Amino acid sequence: VRYDDYRSATTDYLQNGDKTWISQDRVTKRFGALYAFENGISPFISYSEGFKPISPQGTLTSKEVKPTTSKQVEGGVKYLLAEYATTFTASVFNIRQKNVLSATPTWDYRQTGEIESKGAELSIVSRPADNVTLIANYAYTHAINTEDETYEGKRPTQVPENVFNLWGDYTFDNTPLRGLNVGAGVRYTGPMEISPANDKGKLGGTTQYDMAVSYRLGEAIPSLSGVTLKASAQNITNKETFSCYDDNNCWIGRDRTVQVGASYSF
């Protein structure tokens, strides 16, 4: 059980410094259960509620604005193939969101009555060797506006029907490169609606590639034991991507991004 109490004050300097006060609170619940059989099969179920405060935006006044709330039910089964250190997970889910904030073609904001998302997820996590990890995920989502004066029955924007991720990494052991870890992956995001009215076509699906490398310095310099250097790159081919609230509100996605850093473990 969780309790959120959100309060905010907004000052409009274009309207003589008028202030708008918002107070929103909610108690949310979450629980789950899993039973592990000796044969490696583990059915599970979970329920969770969400709460997201929303502040006045555009012509959406403090009297009209409501927090976004959600309820999610998920159930599935895990299967551990111990001999191959591999876990398979399959699940189905249903999510209902109320009062979702969305942009309008007139550069304003409104709140959608209810959006229902239901679908299925599949994932595999495997360690075929002590120094090898493979991860694959796939999700199918059918999302639709179920309560809305304008867009009822339409698919919301920014929600792809299909998403797929694949990642693998390898750690060098018992070689001159001991302490070095390299990884690579691919991400696929399916087509998405451009307009909430579903009348402007779709953004095409995109495929992006990522890489990562890290090195434990202590393997080469014992006095630096605990220090790890890291570098990662997302969208290494610099694939151009887009996302849209509607046909008047679109933006370019993140270009190739490289990050470097270091960490120390005590």
Task: Indicate where each model-derived feature is located.
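Transmembrane beta-strands of outer-membrane beta-barrel proteins
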Residues: V1, P43, T86-A90, L134-A136, ...
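C-terminal beta-signal and adjacent terminal beta-strands/loops
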Residues: R96, L177, R187-S195, Y215-F266
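Gram-negative outer-membrane beta-barrel transporters
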Residues: N94, Q111-P196, E240, S263
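Structural signature of Gram-negative outer-membrane beta-barrels, strongest in the C-terminal barrel
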Residues: V1-Q97
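Short loop/turn motifs that connect adjacent beta-strands in outer-membrane beta-barrel proteins
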Residues: E38-G40, L81-A85, N131, D173-L180, ...
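Residues on the lipid-exposed face of transmembrane beta-strands in outer-membrane beta-barrel proteins
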Residues: F31-Y35, G75-Y79, L122-S126, A136, ...
